[in-house]
């Protein structure tokens, strides 16, 4: 399933987001709510669904490409390939299922292993189903403490009420954008350094 692409989008900045987490935590529901303003409660798990949408990020038109990966162990072997293509990750668990919170550590380790050559990986920890407070199994303090330990932001969302849905996607895109700008600056700095060295060498030869 994919959103329709319009002409002219190819020239816009593209931010690639990967949805990660156990099965049934609401990754697809969050994605569909963000994409189409729809709450889909029952969703058949697949290997992965890709979506693309044009949005305005801090006054700039950009594209967000969302890959919604399946959380089932059956797909663990192919998950590495999806992670390699990602620029940022929403690590999702359900606040009503502590086991899904525990699983985030393993998913994070897999991301870090696949992206080992990168310094700081844009990642947010997302506690979904905040509308089911009466069924909460994961205390806010516990989730926030884990996120702080990992040096990332923790946000609670509800795909049903749309609470903080836009926030997590836009905050992650900002982190991706910041990382890209930093990398481009480093590349330009190295290139400038090489040019200066080349100029000095030419001067010496003269």
UniProtKB/Swiss-Prot annotation:
<keyword id="KW-1003">Cell membrane</keyword>
<feature type="lipid moiety-binding region" description="S-geranylgeranyl cysteine">
    <location>
        <position position="203"/>
    </location>
</feature>
<keyword id="KW-0472">Membrane</keyword>
<dbReference type="InterPro" id="IPR020849">
    <property type="entry name" value="Small_GTPase_Ras-type"/>
</dbReference>
<keyword id="KW-0547">Nucleotide-binding</keyword>
<dbReference type="GO" id="GO:0003925">
    <property type="term" value="F:G protein activity"/>
</dbReference>
<dbReference type="GO" id="GO:0051301">
    <property type="term" value="P:cell division"/>
</dbReference>
<keyword id="KW-0132">Cell division</keyword>
<keyword id="KW-0053">Apoptosis</keyword>
<dbReference type="GO" id="GO:0007165">
    <property type="term" value="P:signal transduction"/>
</dbReference>
<dbReference type="GO" id="GO:0005886">
    <property type="term" value="C:plasma membrane"/>
</dbReference>
<keyword id="KW-0449">Lipoprotein</keyword>
<keyword id="KW-0636">Prenylation</keyword>
<feature type="binding site">
    <location>
        <begin position="158"/>
        <end position="160"/>
    </location>
    <ligand>
        <name>GTP</name>
    </ligand>
</feature>
<dbReference type="GO" id="GO:0001928">
    <property type="term" value="P:regulation of exocyst assembly"/>
</dbReference>
<comment type="similarity">
    <text>Belongs to the small GTPase superfamily. Ras family.</text>
</comment>
<dbReference type="Pfam" id="PF00071">
    <property type="entry name" value="Ras"/>
</dbReference>
<feature type="propeptide" description="Removed in mature form">
    <location>
        <begin position="204"/>
        <end position="206"/>
    </location>
</feature>
<keyword id="KW-0131">Cell cycle</keyword>
<feature type="binding site">
    <location>
        <begin position="128"/>
        <end position="131"/>
    </location>
    <ligand>
        <name>GTP</name>
    </ligand>
</feature>
<keyword id="KW-0488">Methylation</keyword>
<feature type="compositionally biased region" description="Basic and acidic residues">
    <location>
        <begin position="180"/>
        <end position="189"/>
    </location>
</feature>
<keyword id="KW-0378">Hydrolase</keyword>
<protein>
    <recommendedName>
        <fullName>Ras-related protein Ral-B</fullName>
        <ecNumber>3.6.5.2</ecNumber>
    </recommendedName>
</protein>
<dbReference type="GO" id="GO:0005525">
    <property type="term" value="F:GTP binding"/>
</dbReference>
<feature type="binding site">
    <location>
        <begin position="21"/>
        <end position="29"/>
    </location>
    <ligand>
        <name>GTP</name>
    </ligand>
</feature>
<feature type="short sequence motif" description="Effector region">
    <location>
        <begin position="43"/>
        <end position="51"/>
    </location>
</feature>
<dbReference type="GO" id="GO:0030496">
    <property type="term" value="C:midbody"/>
</dbReference>
<dbReference type="GO" id="GO:0006915">
    <property type="term" value="P:apoptotic process"/>
</dbReference>
<dbReference type="GO" id="GO:0060178">
    <property type="term" value="P:regulation of exocyst localization"/>
</dbReference>
<dbReference type="InterPro" id="IPR001806">
    <property type="entry name" value="Small_GTPase"/>
</dbReference>
<keyword id="KW-0342">GTP-binding</keyword>
<feature type="modified residue" description="Cysteine methyl ester">
    <location>
        <position position="203"/>
    </location>
</feature>
<comment type="function">
    <text>Multifunctional GTPase involved in a variety of cellular processes including gene expression, cell migration, cell proliferation, oncogenic transformation and membrane trafficking. Accomplishes its multiple functions by interacting with distinct downstream effectors. Acts as a GTP sensor for GTP-dependent exocytosis of dense core vesicles. Required both to stabilize the assembly of the exocyst complex and to localize functional exocyst complexes to the leading edge of migrating cells. Required for suppression of apoptosis.</text>
</comment>
<dbReference type="GO" id="GO:0003924">
    <property type="term" value="F:GTPase activity"/>
</dbReference>
<feature type="binding site">
    <location>
        <begin position="68"/>
        <end position="72"/>
    </location>
    <ligand>
        <name>GTP</name>
    </ligand>
</feature>
<dbReference type="InterPro" id="IPR005225">
    <property type="entry name" value="Small_GTP-bd"/>
</dbReference>
<dbReference type="InterPro" id="IPR027417">
    <property type="entry name" value="P-loop_NTPase"/>
</dbReference>
<feature type="region of interest" description="Disordered">
    <location>
        <begin position="180"/>
        <end position="206"/>
    </location>
</feature>
<comment type="subunit">
    <text>Interacts with EXOC2/Sec5 and EXOC8/Exo84. Interacts (via effector domain) with RALBP1.</text>
</comment>
């Amino acid at each position: 399933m994919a959103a329709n692409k319009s002409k002219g989008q190819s020239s816009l900045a593209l931010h690639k987001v990967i949805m990660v987490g156990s099965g049934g935590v609401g990754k697809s529901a969050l994605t569909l709510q963000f994409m189409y303003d729809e709450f889909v409660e029952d969703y058949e798990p697949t290997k992965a669904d890709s979506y693309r949408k044009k949005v305005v990020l801090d006054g700039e038109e950009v594209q967000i490409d969302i890959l919604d990966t399946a959380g089932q162990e059956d797909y663990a072997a192919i998950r590495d390939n999806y992670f390699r293509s990602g620029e940022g990750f929403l690590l999702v668990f359900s606040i009503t299922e502590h086991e899904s919170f525990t699983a985030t550590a393993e998913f994070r380790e897999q991301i870090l292993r696949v992206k080992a050559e990168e310094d700081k990986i844009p990642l947010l920890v997302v506690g979904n189903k905040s509308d089911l407070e009466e069924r909460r199994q994961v205390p806010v303090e516990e989730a926030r403490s884990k996120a702080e330990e990992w040096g990332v932001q923790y946000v609670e969302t509800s795909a049903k009420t749309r609470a903080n849905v836009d926030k997590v996607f836009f905050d992650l895109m900002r982190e991706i954008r910041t990382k890209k700008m930093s990398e481009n600056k480093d590349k330009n700095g190295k290139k400038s350094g090489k040019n200066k060295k080349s100029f000095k060498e030419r001067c010496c030869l003269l």
